[in-house]
Amino acid sequence: MLILISPAKTLDYQSPLATTRYTQPELLEYSQQLIGIARKLSAPQIGKLMSISDKLADLNATRFHDWHPDFTPQNARQAILAFKGDVYTGLQAETLTEDDFDFAQQHLRMLSGLYGVLRPLDLMQPYRLEMGIRLENPRGKDLYQFWGDTITEKLNQALRDQGDDIVINLASDEYFKSVKTPKLQGQLIKPVFLDEKNGKFKVISFYAKKARGLMSRYIIENRLTQPEQLKAFNSEGYFFDADASEKGELVFKRHEQ
């Protein structure tokens, strides 16, 4: 079972580390190409491209300039501990055990605009480069064209290494679009999280993102290997709704809090 999640814009390079173990990202030669392109952009150009404030544009121009491919624990941090968005609030990686990290390293992958595919313990230097950004490059007009089949090939390798063909898609549409599904050698399962509001169940972005992290943690902590086992997920009040689910899509609902 291979879990896919999105990265986060919010980063944490200060908190105590839950593990000192680390690995190196496997697609750094691609990252270097993107950094080379990004370094040619001025801060105002970065601001316009990413629709961010002047302050954030300056920060990310500095990050691109400071980035270099010699990753050490002194200048980088394990990806699963560096990302700090809603998904990672649900995942709570800072409380995982060493055995949990072992399982996650084999069964969890983070999709990334700059790094392509990250394993949990892969070191990464801080960046902001969302997958949906239209950054022109030698392979095309955006990052989807830049990455081409590379991300899919890396995921196929991970599927072979971990021994089955089940892919749990907990990534956002923006990031999952970087995966060429016809070429993915796996059976796709997409959990969907619906929260009740005014008597109706619907996707509420903040809750859905956190739930993706909760589900990731549930799989890791319980060492799940079969899709059927996902149906028992009940963190923070969610329950499986068989009637609303269909092939390839598992629907979980939660009553109004």
Curated annotation (Swiss-Prot):
Pfam families xref list: H2O2_YaaD (PF03883)
Motif segment (Helix-hairpin-helix): 35-66
Phenotype reported upon loss of the gene: Significantly reduced survival of bacteria in the presence of 1 mM H(2)O(2); out competed by wild-type in the presence of H(2)O(2). In mouse infections bacteria survive about 100-fold less well than wild-type after 45 hours. Increased bacterial burden in neutropenic mice (depleted of Ly6G polymorphonuclear cells).
Main location class: cytoplasm
Sequence similarity: Belongs to the UPF0246 family.
Record-linked NCBIfam families: PRK02101.1-1, PRK02101.1-3
A GO term for molecular function: DNA binding
GO cellular component, one term: cytosol
Subcellular location: Cytoplasm
Species per Swiss-Prot/TrEMBL record: Klebsiella pneumoniae subsp. pneumoniae (strain HS11286)
HAMAP family the UniProt entry points to: UPF0246
Protein name: DNA-binding and peroxide stress resistance protein YaaA
Key words of the record: Cytoplasm, DNA-binding, Virulence
Role this protein plays: Protects bacteria from neutrophil-related defense upon infection of mammals. Binds DNA.
Keyword Transmembrane helix tagged: no
Gene Ontology annotations of biological process type: response to hydroperoxide
Gene (name only): yaaA
